[in-house]
């Protein structure tokens, strides 16, 4: 597909062609362009912890699904849930005041799992939390009776950036953080091993 790109004020324009490969040299464009059907569904009809929006998800190499869900009537909460496809999550942990949960990533380290997520969210006028100022790497510790506040684990601050969202690629030693400045969205790349 061809994707147009532009600055918010349209002062700079670009067009890029994107080709997606599945590692075998085959393009996935044909697969992704066919009509939606049951063969494309990985998991369905899963009830999460709250009757609220799932903000994002990740999938482990073994197929385990991870969900990030808003707290509903508890706007300061995010739920990180883990489970098998087509099944209710087996456990979860709660994060308080982290932000909106727009994105997160799961890092696999042997039998341990770590969550990379925006943290230190700001309370907005509508009572919701958003615009995280830091990124945290948290050891996944499911406990239904404990809430982790603001940040935890290893926490990283990028000066003059907000609304930060991490992504990782452990195979290629990449940590990417997308963040906002005034009117611009930045993509900042680091070696993951430098952060650890």
Residue ranges of predicted features:
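Short glycine/acidic-enriched loop and turn motifs that connect beta-strands
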Residues: 71-75, 111, 120-126, 180-185
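Hydrophobic, aromatic-enriched interface-forming segments
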Residues: 157-196
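Beta-strand-rich domains and repeat architectures in extracellular enzymes and scaffolds
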Residues: 43-76
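Blade-loop segments of beta-propeller domains
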Residues: 78-113, 119
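Repeated scaffold domains used in trafficking and secretory/extracellular systems
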Residues: 50-58, 96-107, 153-169
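Entry beta-strands of beta-propeller and related beta-repeat scaffolds
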Residues: 63-67, 110-117, 172-176
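Beta-propeller blade signature
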Residues: 76-86, 129-143, 186-195
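A short beta-strand motif characteristic of beta-propeller blades
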Residues: 39-48, 88-95, 148-158
């Amino acid at each position: 597909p061809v994707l147009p790109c532009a600055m918010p004020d349209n002062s700079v324009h670009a067009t890029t062609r994107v080709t997606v490969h599945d590692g075998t040299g085959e393009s996935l464009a044909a697969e992704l362009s066919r009509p939606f059907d049951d063969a494309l569904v990985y998991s369905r009809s899963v009830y999460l912890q709250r009757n609220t929006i799932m903000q994002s998800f990740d999938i482990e190499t073994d197929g385990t699904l991870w969900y990030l869900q808003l707290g509903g009537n508890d706007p300061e909460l995010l739920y990180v849930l883990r489970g098998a496809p087509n099944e209710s999550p087996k456990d979860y942990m709660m994060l308080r005041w982290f932000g909106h949960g727009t994105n997160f990533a799961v890092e696999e380290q042997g039998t341990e799992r770590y969550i990379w997520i925006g943290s230190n969210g700001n309370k907005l006028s509508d009572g919701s939390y958003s615009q995280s100022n830091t990124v945290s790497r948290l050891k996944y510790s499911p406990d239904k009776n404990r809430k982790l506040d603001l940040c935890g684990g290893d926490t990283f601050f990028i000066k003059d950036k907000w609304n930060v969202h991490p992504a990782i690629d452990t195979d290629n030693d990449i940590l990417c953080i997308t963040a906002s400045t005034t009117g611009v969205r930045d993509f900042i790349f680091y070696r993951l091993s430098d952060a650890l």
